[in-house]
């Protein structure tokens, strides 16, 4: 082989040793067999060698930090010089330790412990030994908003891996998820259990372009059921065969005796150890073990798991149950108890409120019921009232012993030293706060106690009975006063109603419930317009006469005829004080006088009409009225009873206006055409 081929082979070996040309000294292998193998080996072997070399160099370059060119040259020169290895300077600070030292110390501590105090576990290699910190979703959202990885990645000075970008994408997903959850919570659409979304089978199949429908799936399940029934019948037959074979074997071999127990001495050493470790089933003892949450089969490793396992050492806890401070989702403890106040009474006359008296037994009972019923003040009030201290007074309950829901709440917050207004939540929280503040102001200004009063047994024996009787008499006095006020109101209302009835006897009240007809409304409108028009004309005439009387000069006396007697001067109307009236007042006075005259004329006309009607009115006897009705019914048999009655009334009214009565004999033929003509019409004319 000449030098040209040898140099080319060295270049190829250099490429295989350093594909990315990171070695500036152009090193190559000196192994002649490896160089000649490139020539003698097949092409696929040489190609695979190149691939492996390139992959190995890529893996090394990915985890190798970026080193400047000058520093890399210096390191390679130092490596070629092969000087003495540098000494590693150890830190003089005891608190600074490397990770290797910490791991070694932990291992030494575990090895020094006795085996009874350790738990040796085999864990898959990919599982971490320590559980990572679990952060709530709100904290993760806060971290993604303050220190977002997507903002830190562009300015990073280190090599970025795929895991870094995946964590940044996961943070973005967490932010979107948290914001969506909070939005659903505000709308009241978020629950702990999300139901599966319903898909319409026909729409879903049409979108996914499937050819199978619900009926196809139903037929497929029917085939499965048929196969299942067929196999179940085969299984039953097989069970019968097994039982028959067992019975046959029993009757054939019952003369031969078999040993029903095992002698431990005949067993091997391994079998003896297995029997020795078998659990012994005895009666129930005092030491009971809590069943695990997961099944036992989940603790057994799969038989076909070929992954590597690592050994983990853990301190052994001798107590059976692990006491933890973390509560589950439906735990009994809460962060804080929400205090929901009941509906407060009205703050009217709050300064006259009588304080309630609470004994030590009542306070204990109140605290017990509050813890039992969890601030359900209605139930608390019922239970405390049923077991009240007033034994002798069963039908009467004084104000100082009354136990309403609000009084129970007021006494509870008085016993609670750590109570704050911010602890109250619910519908009546604001109203309760306003009531308590107003009661405190009234108590400080009036110097009178309003809040509940807690007393001891010695104070109860002295004054409780007097306070009870005083409260009873006070309640009786208030009840009597209320009755007197109610009776006085009723009597005053009756006297006022009687006086109004006496005044309005002559004035009949119009029927306010009756709705006027359109004809009546049009008539009233016509009368109103007519009255207004007449008043306007009268005002203009009166104004013209007054202007003529005031402004027109007196005519000169004629020389021929003798002078008439001088007319009396027209005096201008004045007030009782002598002040002359203005033109507007005079017009108003004239209008009132005219209106009074018109009313007098209308009354006179009405009286005259009533007098004339009384004179013209003719009283018909019942026999004549019935005779007229019968005649009309005979002449018009097709009319109804109401129509016949109306025709008879019209006929009698026309007779009364003409001034003569009904003849005693039947109506003659020549008068029938004159008088009975309105009765012989059709019902439509009637």
UniProtKB/Swiss-Prot annotation:
Identify the residues that the record assigns to the HSA domain, covering every copy. Answer: 202-280
Q: Which residues cross the membrane?
A: none
Localization in the cell: Nucleus
> What Gene Ontology terms describe what this protein does at the molecular function level?
chromatin binding
What keywords would UniProt list here? Activator, Chromatin regulator, DNA damage, DNA repair, Nucleus, Transcription, Transcription regulation
- The biased composition feature labelled Polar residues covers 497-506, 574-588, 671-686
GO biological process per UniProt: chromatin remodeling; DNA repair
Top-rank taxon of the source lineage equals Eukaryota
Which family does the record claim for this protein? Answer: Belongs to the EAF1 family.
What is the protein name given in its UniProt record?
Answer: Chromatin modification-related protein EAF1
> Native species of this protein?
Candida albicans (strain SC5314 / ATCC MYA-2876)
Q: What is the lineage of its organism?
A: Eukaryota, Fungi, Dikarya, Ascomycota, Saccharomycotina
* Gene expressing this chain: VID21
């Amino acid at each position: 082989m000449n030098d040209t081929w040898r140099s080319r082979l060295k270049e190829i070996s250099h490429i295989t040793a350093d594909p990315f040309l990171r070695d500036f000294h152009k090193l190559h292998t000196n192994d002649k067999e490896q160089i000649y193998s490139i020539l003698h080996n097949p092409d696929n072997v040489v190609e695979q060698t190149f691939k492996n070399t390139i992959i190995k160099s890529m893996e090394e370059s990915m985890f190798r930090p970026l080193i400047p060119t000058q520093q890399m040259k210096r390191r390679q020169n130092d490596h070629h010089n092969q000087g003495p290895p540098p000494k590693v300077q150890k830190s003089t600070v005891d608190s600074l330790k490397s990770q290797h030292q910490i791991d070694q110390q932990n291992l030494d501590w575990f090895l020094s412990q006795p085996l009874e105090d350790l738990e040796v576990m085999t864990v898959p290699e990919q599982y971490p030994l320590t559980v990572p910190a679990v952060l709530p979703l709100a904290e993760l959202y806060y971290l993604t908003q303050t220190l977002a990885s997507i903002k830190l990645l562009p300015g990073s000075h280190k090599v970025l891996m795929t895991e870094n970008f995946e964590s940044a994408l996961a943070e973005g997903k967490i932010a979107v998820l948290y914001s969506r959850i909070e939005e659903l919570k505000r709308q009241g659409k978020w629950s702990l259990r999300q139901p599966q979304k319903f898909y319409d089978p026909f729409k879903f199949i049409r979108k996914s372009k499937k050819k199978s429908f619900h009926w196809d799936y139903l037929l497929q399940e029917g085939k499965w059921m048929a196969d299942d029934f067929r196999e179940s019948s085969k299984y039953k037959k097989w069970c019968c065969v097994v039982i028959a074979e067992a019975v046959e074997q029993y009757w054939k071999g019952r003369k031969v005796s078999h040993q029903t127990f095992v002698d431990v001495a005949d067993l091997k050493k391994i079998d003896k150890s297995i029997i020795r470790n078998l659990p012994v089933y005895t009666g129930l003892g005092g030491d009971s073990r809590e069943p695990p949450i997961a099944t036992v089969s989940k603790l057994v490793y799969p038989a076909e798991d070929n992954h590597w396992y690592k050994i983990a050492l853990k301190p052994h806890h001798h107590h059976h149950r692990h006491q933890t401070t973390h509560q589950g989702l439906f735990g009994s403890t809460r962060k804080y108890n929400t205090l929901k106040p009941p509906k407060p009474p009205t703050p009217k006359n709050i300064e006259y409120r009588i304080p309630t008296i609470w004994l030590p037994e009542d306070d204990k009972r109140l605290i017990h019921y509050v813890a039992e019923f969890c601030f359900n003040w209605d139930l608390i009030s019922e239970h405390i009232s049923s077991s009240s201290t007033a034994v002798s007074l069963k039908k009467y309950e004084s104000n100082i012993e009354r136990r309403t829901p609000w009084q129970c709440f007021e006494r509870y917050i008085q016993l609670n030293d750590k109570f704050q207004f911010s602890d109250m939540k619910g519908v009546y929280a604001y109203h309760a706060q306003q009531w308590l503040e107003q009661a405190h102001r009234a108590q400080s200004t009036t110097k009178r106690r309003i809040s509940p009063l807690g007393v001891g047994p010695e104070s109860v024996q002295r004054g409780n009975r007097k306070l009870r009787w005083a409260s009873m008499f006070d309640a009786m006095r208030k009840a009597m006063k209320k009755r007197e006020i109610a009776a006085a109101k009723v009597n005053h209302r009756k006297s006022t109603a009687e006086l109004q009835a006496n005044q309005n006897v002559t004035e009949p009240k119009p029927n306010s419930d009756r709705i006027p007809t359109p004809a009546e409304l049009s008539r009233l409108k016509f009368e109103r317009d007519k009255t207004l028009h007449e008043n306007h004309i009268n005002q203009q005439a009166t104004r013209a006469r007054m202007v003529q009387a005031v402004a027109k000069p007196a005519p000169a006396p004629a020389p021929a005829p003798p002078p008439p007697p001088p007319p009396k001067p027209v005096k201008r109307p004045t007030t009782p004080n002598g002040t002359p009236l203005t033109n507007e007042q005079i017009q108003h006075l004239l209008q009132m006088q005219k209106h009074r005259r018109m009313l007098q004329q209308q009354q006179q006309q009405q009286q005259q009409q009533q007098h004339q009607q009384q004179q013209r009115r003719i009283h018909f006897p019942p026999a004549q009225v019935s005779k007229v009705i019968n005649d009309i019914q005979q002449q018009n048999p097709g009319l109804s009873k109401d129509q016949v009655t109306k025709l008879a009334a019209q006929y009698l009214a026309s007779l009364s206006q003409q001034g003569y009565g009904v003849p005693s004999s039947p109506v003659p033929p020549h008068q029938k055409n004159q008088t009975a003509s309105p009765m012989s019409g059709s019902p439509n004319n009637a």
